[in-house]
């Protein structure tokens, strides 16, 4: 499906043909990607799906340091990963990037993705001849099709699952969402610096447990870890980057609600970011689960 950006007026006067080369990309929309991923899971086809969202794409252009402090090591690792994936089979290693126009994201636009900064980064660092996918396609807080989210959860619950995620995630929440899971814990603060030890631990656990699916919610450690595991495990297990979708359920577990500009600690250890209120998203999903 070919997507083009119009005259730029919808982007605050920015010209997509100059700043965002996405008008010429071959893209798969959220619905298309979801169909591919769900079918892969149903048919036990091994694949990986990683999301290069506003975090890493903004970070490499020094525009986004709220999740990690500025560090050339992180920036260079991301750029190296971007180049590596160009050589991977595009059906085996699917790459999701921000594409939050209504046609790509089921009629809804993400309130958080910094799409302009992301596309400037893409133009510099990603192979624009590669096939890309709308990055909200798995189950997303932003594209709040909660029934689709439950469909994804049900598919995953039928598998043997490992979650590589925040050390603060309560196992009760993980088991509620994804079934009886194994949790490889990731540091809450500056997770990137632990990506090599995380990779080694996942390999160890995979050899011992032979998981069907490994889910990643590991902040900046997700990207280098998934790339490394794809190579070291020789594409032998399905890996899916689920972003921060677990977070609203953790907030609900601890009875945390929206705190705009609140005194919260981010993954960089800094204070002052905010937690968005996804109360309705969580409530709707919990109701569907309870009614099943």
Give the location of each predicted region.
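Short catalytic-loop micro-motif centered on adjacent basic/acidic residues
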Residues: 213-217
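A short, acidic, amphipathic alpha-helical segment used as a generic capping/interface helix at domain edges
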Residues: 32-35, 77-84, 196-206, 222-223
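Electropositive, gly/pro-rich neighborhoods at or near active sites that engage anionic ligands
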Residues: 1-177
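Residue-level detector of flexible, active-site-proximal loop/helix-junction positions
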Residues: 102, 188-190, 246
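Residues at the C-termini of beta-strands that transition into short coil/loop
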Residues: 99, 185-187, 243
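Conserved nucleotide-cofactor-binding alpha/beta core module
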Residues: 114-115, 161-212
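Short glycine-rich anion-binding loops that position phosphate/pyrophosphate groups of nucleotides
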Residues: 55, 101, 219-221, 245
């Amino acid at each position: 499906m070919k997507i083009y950006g119009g005259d730029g007026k919808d982007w605050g006067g920015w010209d997509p043909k100059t700043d965002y080369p996405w008008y010429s990309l071959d893209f798969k929309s959220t619905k298309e990607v979801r169909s591919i991923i769900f079918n892969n899971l149903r048919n036990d086809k091994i694949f990986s799906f990683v999301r290069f969202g506003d975090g890493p794409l903004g970070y490499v252009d020094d525009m986004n340091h709220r999740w990690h402090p500025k560090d050339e090591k992180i920036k260079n690792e991301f750029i190296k990963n971007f180049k590596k994936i160009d050589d991977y089979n595009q059906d085996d290693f699917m790459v999701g990037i921000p594409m939050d126009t209504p046609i790509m994201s089921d009629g809804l636009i993400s309130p958080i993705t910094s799409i302009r900064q992301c596309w400037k980064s893409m133009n510099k660092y990603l192979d624009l001849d590669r096939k890309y996918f709308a990055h909200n396609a798995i189950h997303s807080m932003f594209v709040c099709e909660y029934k689709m989210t439950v469909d994804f959860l049900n598919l995953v619950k039928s598998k043997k699952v490992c979650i590589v995620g925040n050390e603060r995630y309560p196992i009760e929440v993980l088991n509620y969402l994804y079934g009886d899971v194994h949790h490889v814990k990731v540091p809450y603060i500056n997770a990137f610096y632990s990506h090599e030890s995380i990779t080694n631990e996942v390999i160890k656990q995979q050899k011992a447990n032979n998981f069907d699916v490994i889910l990643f919610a590991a902040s900046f450690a997700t990207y280098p870890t998934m790339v490394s595991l794809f190579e070291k495990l020789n594409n032998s297990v399905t890996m899916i980057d689920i972003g921060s979708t677990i977070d609203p359920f953790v907030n609900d577990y601890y009875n945390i609600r929206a705190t705009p500009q609140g005194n919260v600690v981010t993954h960089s250890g800094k204070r002052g970011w905010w937690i968005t209120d996804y109360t309705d998203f969580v409530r709707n999903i919990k109701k569907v689960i309870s009614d099943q």
